[in-house]
């Protein structure tokens, strides 16, 4: 059977830029008559008004999606602390009275649940950024230590994992759709 039509996928930029594009490229080659559109967004509610067909979302581990959506976990995200080697030479996070600082996540800073059991909770926050791309760039500029997904930061040659910090799985990647889309036929 030959499939045709359009599919709209929404996802966060971190997934789109670092994980999704190879899959979209293969899909487009296998199904040339299906036009795939990728919309960058972090809102789960995009599915509510039939704006998109599929949402790929990063959700805290063990958190379930809203009841009006169906889906499954398609991956796990390991996170770890990163900095430049130069920053770590100048600011050892493990010495008492360390001058090392964290690059915080958005408005929450260290109040974010992600920092609850952090080995670096004792450090102050130098700045806050609500986007992984900004945090990556800030860390590359030696502005501090940042907590990033390993699939992003491990590829960055100017960053290293902070010694004594092990990657942790804190988030799942969910593929979600509206429950009434379960039986949608492809033309």
PLM features: residue spans?
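Central regulatory/effector-binding core of bacterial HTH transcription factors
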Residues: 4-66
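Short loop or secondary-structure boundary microenvironments that flank
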Residues: 13, 152, 179-180
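Short, well-ordered beta-strand segments
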Residues: 8-10, 55, 103, 146, ...
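A late-sequence structural motif
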Residues: 165-187
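C-terminal regulatory
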Residues: 49, 63-173
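Residue-level signal for threonine
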Residues: 12, 84, 184
């Amino acid at each position: 059977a030959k499939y045709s039509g359009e599919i709209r996928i929404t996802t966060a930029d971190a997934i789109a830029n670092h994980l999704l594009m190879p899959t979209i490229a293969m899909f487009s080659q296998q199904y040339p008559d299906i036009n795939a559109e990728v919309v960058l967004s972090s809102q789960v509610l995009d599915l509510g008004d039939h704006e998109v067909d599929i949402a790929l979302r990063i959700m805290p581990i063990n958190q379930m999606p809203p009841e009006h959506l169906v889906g499954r976990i398609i991956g796990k995200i390991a996170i770890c602390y990163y900095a430049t080697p130069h920053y770590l030479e100048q600011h050892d996070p493990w010495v008492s009275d360390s001058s090392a600082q964290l690059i915080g996540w958005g408005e929450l800073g260290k109040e974010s649940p992600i920092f609850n059991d952090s080995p670096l909770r004792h450090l102050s926050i130098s700045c806050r950024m609500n986007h992984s791309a900004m945090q990556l760039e800030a860390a590359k500029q030696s502005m501090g230590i940042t907590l990033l997904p390993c699939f992003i930061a491990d590829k960055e040659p100017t960053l290293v994992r902070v010694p004594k910090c092990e990657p942790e799985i804190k988030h799942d990647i969910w593929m979600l759709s509206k429950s009434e889309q379960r039986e949608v036929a492809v033309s």
